[in-house]
Amino acid sequence: VIETLGVVLKKSAYQEDRVLLDLFTEQHGKIKVLARRSRKARYSDQIFELGHWQLKAGKVFYFAEDYDSVQHAFIKGLNVWSGYYLNELLMRLMSAHHPDAALFTHYWRALAALEHADAELQEWMLRAFEKALLETLGAMPDLTTDSDGDEIEANLNYYVGIEAGLSKHPFKMSTPVMP
């Protein structure tokens, strides 16, 4: 039996009495879990809920043996869309069984920030998660120099281009592109 912290990213009906969960875990990365669906089920298939999972490894996916809720991110209103955005990033970009405890921590902190009304904190945590994900994937651009080879200057604004990388922003902006 494998024990791990995990958050449900997505749930899909599998059979009448079972559900297939895409779970993002601290020790095993993104995995698929088959869980029984019943009134007495000891697991939660609610997204944005951190839980302590006991799993049994199978050939294709894991089987949920036991579950204890640890904490739920009570995300309301339009912030739910930001939570779905985080889940979609993980679903589409992370390969299965790619553990990264630091990324898991960034993910959970970003979800927790979405509970609060502080838009600045939410933006900061979303960007921190995106940066951590890019680093995990090996796709983070160099942020020490710009596309011209010049060192980054604190008083200038920059943007990230697909081909060029980090470039000086041609216009003066009232708010920085990267805080």
Language-model regions, residue ranges each:
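Non-catalytic alpha-helical scaffolds and adjoining flexible linkers that form interface surfaces
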Residues: 1-18, 24-179
